[in-house]
Amino acid sequence: MKVIITGTSSGIGKAIAMHYLQQGFSVIGIGRKHTIDHADYQPVVCDLTDEKAIRSLDAESWTSDDILLVNNAGMLGIVKRLSDQDSPDIGAVMALNAIAPALLMNKLARTCEAAAKSLTVVNISSGAAKRAIPSWSAYCASKAALEMLSETFYLEEQEKGRNTKVYCVAPGVVDTPMQAQIRSVDSTDFAASGTFHDYYEKGELASPQLVAQKLNRLLEMPYSGEVFYSLRSIE
C-alpha cells in the first residue's frame, strides 16, 4: 500500500506521515511546504488551493500499489464575524478544505480503477461540520461540504461496484498550529476564545501522534460501510 497525505509539514498530517513511515510504508506528501526528511517520503510541491496545479499531478505514477489517500490539509481562515471581514477569504478556505479533496478523490478513483488497485480515502473533518460556530463561517461551511462530499462519493463508488472505503473523521481538539491560531484571536472577534484557552491551559488538547495512532486503529478494524467517525471514541 502507498500512502498519500496532504498537508504534512506539521500537526496531524505530519504525525500520520511519520506513523506510516515508521511502519515501513512509502508516503507521498502533497503541499506547499515539506519538513520530513526520510528515504521513503516523496515530497510533491503543490498549492492545493490551485485547481490547475492539482489537475496536473501525475497520479498515474502513484498507483502501482493500492492507495490510502488522507485529505488532511486545511485552513481555518479569517476568524471574525462574516459581516466584519473587509476581505473575506471564503474562496481560499473552500478551495483547500473541500475542493482539493474532491479533485484528489476524482483523480485517484479514476487512476486506481484503471490500474485495478483499491482506494481508501480518509477525509479529516471537524465537529464544526455539524455545529455552527460564530466567526468560523467559512470553516464550518467547508467542513460540512467535505462531509457531504465524502458520503456521496462512497455511495457513488458502491453504485459502481467498487470496494472503495471512505472515512470522514473528526479528530477532536488537537494541539496543532490551527489551535495556536485560534488562541491568538481576541474575544472581541471570537466570543468562544476563552474556551480554547482553557483547553490548552488544562492540557486537554490531544497530541497529533495520538490522533495518528487512533486513525490507524480505525483503519485496521473491519470496514462496516460507515463513513463518519469521531476519533475521540476510538480507544
Region annotations inferred by a language model:
Residues 126:
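Residue(s) in the substrate-gating loop at a strand-loop-helix junction
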Residues 168, 176, 186-235:
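C-terminal helical subdomain
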Residues 74-91, 110, 135:
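Conserved mid-core segment of classical short-chain dehydrogenase/reductases
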Residues 9-11, 17:
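N-terminal Rossmann NAD(P)H-binding glycine-rich loop of SDR-like oxidoreductase domains
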Residues 85, 132-140, 152:
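Active-site loop-to-helix junction immediately N-terminal to the catalytic Tyr of the SDR YXXXK motif
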Residues 38-51:
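Rossmann-fold cofactor-recognition segment
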Residues 105, 142:
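Active-site helix of classical SDR
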